[in-house]
């Protein structure tokens, strides 16, 4: 998959710790790309490398086919996991100031700051100090600061961490809008159901290496056959756990999700379900992103 942001062969060590190990992937325009991995997988180091905030031992970061230059980074927007707002500064002044740092005139920065604070439902806190805001509203202001200069690339490290559903929806809508407007959007999250809803593409890494990348739909349609089975009166899938070559991947709301190993016939599973009780549901199912993630990380 090609895109204007290309990371090729990135490597970085911190003493004996290998943070990035020949990591390569691209981020396309017009799509939201989810960047996934366990804690310590190398996601934050990768994002910092895009902005030149960590020195690489090897590899290249390219934008539109050329090495990223300082002028390019002025067209990038970054929301780091460790939030970078000044606690004692007024919200409006903070966002406007960051717009000026990215080359906007004072008037342009003021107009853009008001626009994004309104869009993210925090315009009423324009004259409040950042430190007086709730965690969720600080997240919204941080996103406004990343968007104030209308960036071509938006990189967000755990932007929805700790947010309530309203905050998640608000930020998710903005990311989708940015992608539809032709921007590149890359964001990391441990909330896999959220990534599944928002993203068309995912990159899964661990130990600084890419394990899996591609279209969410294609990844979910691959892998071993899966069944969703609901048996009247069954709450824990005990009947399925006794079947050879069948793995119970999830039990939720009375439905049992099963993974069939090679050579296992679904009719065998159906017969076992019928012996356990009245079968209310028996259907083939796609992999969920959470299953793709677990299988990739488990190896």
Question: What are the roles of these predicted feature ranges?
Answer:
Residues 72, 220-223, 293:
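Short, flexible helix/strand-to-coil boundary loops that buttress conserved ligand/catalytic motifs
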